[in-house]
Amino acid sequence: MEVPGPLRAASGGAARVSVPAKTLRGVLEELERRYPALHRSICDETGKVRPHVNLFVNQQHMRDREGLDTALGPGDVVIILPAVSGG
């Protein structure tokens, strides 16, 4: 999983973390155990992905695949992309 700069403090400074899981949902469950602060940055208290956070699997948005049930295989890359806004 690729972790963007603004969220790296929540992953112990790591730009990439290896998370063994068979689905995107499994990745988030493992993140909750290993990196709870990173999980809270991605998901709300109900476990849903926050509206301003986009998750991609191999450069394809999860909503264009199977959502959190998107299957993952060896070598797949999950990218976290939080929305940026300003005024």
Regions found by a protein language model. Give the residues of each.
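Ubiquitin-like/PB1-type beta-grasp interaction modules and other compact soluble beta-rich domains
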Residues: 1-86
